[in-house]
Each structure stands twice: as structure tokens, then as C-alpha cells.
Amino acid sequence: MKKIKIFSLLLAGSLCFTACDDYLTETPKHSLTTDNAVLDYSGAKNAVNGIYGVYETGGSNLGGYLYSYLQCMAGFWTYSNEMYSMSYKQSSSATASQWSQLYDIINTCNAAINGINKLDDSSFPSVADKNSLLGEARCFRGYCNLELLWLYGHWFDKADSPYGIIYRDQTSELSNLMVGRSTVGESYQYILDDLEFAEQNAPDYTTAYRMNKLFAKAMHAKLLLVRGWEGDYAKALTLVNELLANNSGWQMETDLAKLYENGWNSKENCFSHYLGDNTDSYYGISGYEFMYSYGFYYSNKFTDLVQEWLDNDARHDVTFGTARAPETWDTSTKDNILTKLYHRGRYAGKNDMYATYPMRYAELYLMKAELLARTNPSDIQGALAPLNEMRAKYTNPVLEPVTGISTHQELMDAIFKEYVVALFMENETPWFASLRFEHDGKPWIYTLKPEVNFSENQYCWPIPDDEIHAHSNVIEQNPGLE
């Protein structure tokens, strides 16, 4: 990809402020540019709504594809040998689309943020309304930059590591594309600045269709949990406790079947990749979630230990079932398909609820259990309590409490197993857990795929080849992934 192609792709994001649905607003009546896009309050709202339009139609590899790849890396699934073996290199095509899609969304965020900031406060009903729009856009930008760091940066390094993100806070033009990599510490700070602003100013949670204060706080807590620097666990625990104490509409879906039936309409889903406007296309909604609507049928076996956990869990009959093949020509059916995400598949259910679950309410209880276990390791039952509190809330299926835990290692193994089973293929959390939790003195990932040789350098993907070669300035590739 040449420099001019990168420019055209990125600029396209800033020009295409299309509304997602009536729940957002009407489509803008004029062609938007970075100069005229935000002229008044209505334009500011359209600019923010435009972010969702780019995400909806241009984020097809940021849901099931992404989460499935990460869980192949963890050793849960062998669908992609490249991901399972961690053999990706700079020339790999498998990891390029997530990069471009995230930056397209970030570019649209920047157009909205910068346009709103240029408007005088008097253009808005109130300063709070202005900041609410900024909070929504900055939450989106912070979330996308966090995904970039987690995927393409040394998120696991110290602050002075040079392998952070390529941070962009301006709409992309030829004059500003040649940006170098930030340090890991700088990258985290950019992300936290956006998330913390959103925690204070973004809209309250009312629906998983929109960015909101609670999602910003939850992703802030998850960032700290994954990063694990000094003081991070204590701070994350405070944030999680605040979220659990919040009497908002975000809450557990006690009937687990309803969670997956309702998807982005579920009260347990804090934010989701809304796809409801795409029912009229050839493949309908399923066309934007290939892995969920197709991949799980033809590769429906998971690695031995994980398959055993899933098969023997009380949630199995709710999350697995019988389904038809996704191809027109293939009339076969299979048992033990991950129907919580596959649903009926691309053929029989092209417009089924192929939702994503970046942050479910249930995950807060698991985060709290882990954080208590790490900040107060001697209190085993105290750390186990949130996990069992979460399990006790379910009415379909009814889950028995986890018992027989007497050592810290047994506690950590139980929490890890719950992360995997409860959130399987739904988001990136089980992948990070496979690196963070230890078993037999080393991260769980080594137990899950002992035959694979890898190093910490392979905990992230390479920056795509096109990006490296498009820069006139030197962009350092992640070590070992050249």
C-alpha cells in the first residue's frame, strides 16, 4: 500500500459520517469534509454518529474474527495454525485488516473531536452537552487505541519501551501521516486520558449501541488488570467495586439464553458492535461476522482440556446445540456447535443476533475475584465469593457454587477456568488470562499448547508490512516479527 492509498483510506473515514439507524439521527444532508463537518450542534451530533457508521460497516474484523484469533493464540482452538503457532511475521495478511479498520475508526473519532473542540460553547445547549459528545467520541478513540496497543504493541513492557502505538489525534492528511511510535508508557497515558474524560463526561449507560461512562470505566479497569503495574490492581479493584455498586440499567441477565438471544439489546451487554442495519444485504448480518456465523461450524472442536471444561459445565446445553451448515449446498447438521455465537449459522439464520460482548456485567465479578486474589492472597474465600455470587444469580441454568478450594493455586485455577468457560470466544479476556494466570509455575498458555515454541515477543502481532513501507520515517517493527 502506497502512502497515497493510506491517505485515501483514512480520509474516507472522516468524510463518511452516515447515520447508523433512526436511533442515532438522520443522515447528514451535505457532503462532509474536515472543514465543514461540524458547524453547529446538529453537525456535532452527526459527526459522533458517523463514528458508529464507520464501525458498523467497516469493523467486520474487530469482533468474532479478532476474538477467535486471540483464543487460537491462547491454545483454546486450532482453527488458524498461524495464530495457534504464533508464526505471524510482518508480511502476514491475517493481521493487517484489524490495523486498518481500527485506524479508520480513530480517524473518524479525530474528525469529530477536533470539529467539536473548534466550536464555541455557545453553539451547544450547554457545556455539558458539548462534553457529552466529546466524551462519547473520546471513549471510542480510547477503546480503539487500547485495542491497537493490545494487538500491535508491547503492552506487557515497561513504560520506557519504544514499542507502543502510532498515536494519531488529527484527521489524516499527507502532511501528518509520518508519525513515529510512542513509548508504551505514552501509549497507555493517551488511552487513559480519553477513558478518564469519558468516565466523567460521556452519556450515561442506556443501551449497548452507544459508548457510555460505564464502558469507559470498565475498560479502564480491564486495562489496569491486564497491565499489572505497581498500584494497578488496587486501582482496578476500586473501579470494579464502583461499577458493581452503580444502580444503572447495566446488570446481569440471569437467564443466560436471553443474553445471547438479545445480544446488543441485552441489559448485560455494556457495548456491542451493532449490526442491525444490515439485514437486507446478501448475507445479512452474518456477512459482518464470518467467524461466528460460519467458522464455528466447520471447525467445531476445541483443544482437549478446554473442550472438557466446556462439555462438563452446567452452561453447556445453553451455549452449545445442534445447527445446520452455513453453506447453501451443505445440508448437514452437527451437534455440539457453539450456538451462543453461531446461532443458526449463515444459511438458516443470516440475520440472527451475531453480537459481540466486549464487556459483560458478569465479567465484573470475575475481575473482582481475581483482583481480590492478587491484592489479598491469604483471603481465599473472600476472593472466591464474587465468583460464586455471579454464579448464584443465574436461573437458567442454575449453577452450583465452586467449592473445595483451599489453596491460592486452586483459587487461581478456578478463576481462570471461569474466565475461559464464561467468556469463551466472546472477547479478548480469556487470551490475556492465559498469560496472566500461572499453572505449574508458568503461564497457563504453556499448559494449553506445550508443543509450541514461542517467546514473549509473540504476545503481539507485527505492524503490517504496508504500514512499515509507507513511512518515510523509520517505524521499528516489534522484535522477532520482522
Question: What are the language-model segments listed below?
Answer:
Residues 1-18:
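Sec-dependent bacterial lipoprotein signal peptides
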Residues 48, 106-109, 188, 195, ...:
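Inward-facing hydrophobic residues that define packing positions of alpha-helical scaffold repeats
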Residues 228-231, 237-349, 354-360, 410-431, ...:
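Extended ligand-binding clefts on enzyme/binding-domain cores
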